[in-house]
């Protein structure tokens, strides 16, 4: 469960609440498997103290989303999260808009992740469902890829039937990465409506979902929103090919 938007609500008024740490505890109680938090360069929601406290309390495994910068590398090496997920980042974007271009940055990314891996932190790369990017991720020593599901979700939410072809592309990419020995995750834009399509893909081990869960929690509580999302995932996995 991505808890960024708990911090977004906090930042709207500049208060000390709601506390992402309390959210993490509820995530665990509701059956969540881990916590994802994106420490952006502009600190627009999650801040350094949140990351430190989440790791110190060790409520659930911590996946730190971050840009490929010297500052973020230092923070990861200091905090020692269970995993880092490297994402592209632009200050003007509302949320991450696309996957990391690994194939164009092989040398620099390999150098960037080397000290992180030496600290036994698992490295994930947020990428588009492309064999070219998957090959590049494998070549630099990534442990995990997270497939960007945003385009699929946009089509699905707008009732555009082209989402069916995009799902096929995601499934093909997941199978390809799995055969290469990469662990496969997926995320971005998933809702209770769209999550089933991704959950049916056998090779995808983990889903990172945040905005939809936090949105639903306004009406049904955070625990209830997590439980419903998990149920949707479980139902879809029963019908895997």
Question: What kind of region is each of these model predictions?
Answer:
Residues 55, 98, 157-163, 216-238:
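C-terminal helical cap(s) of enzyme catalytic domains, especially alpha/beta-barrels
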Residues 2-64, 74-81, 136-139, 162-165:
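Conserved N-terminal beta1-alpha1 strand-loop-helix module at the mouth
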Residues 1-3, 35-37, 62-66, 84-86, ...:
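Hydrophobic faces of well-ordered beta-strands that scaffold small-molecule active sites
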Residues 70-79, 130-140, 186, 190-204:
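Catalytic cores of alpha/beta
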Residues 85-93, 144-157, 203-222:
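Glycine-rich phosphate-binding active-site loops on the catalytic face of alpha/beta enzymes
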Residues 122-176:
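Histidine/lysine/aspartate-rich catalytic loop segments that bind and position anionic ligands
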Residues 2-20, 61-68, 95-103, 120-129, ...:
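Active-site mouth loops of central-metabolism enzymes
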Residues 28, 52-56, 110-120, 138, ...:
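Surface-exposed amphipathic alpha-helices with a cationic face
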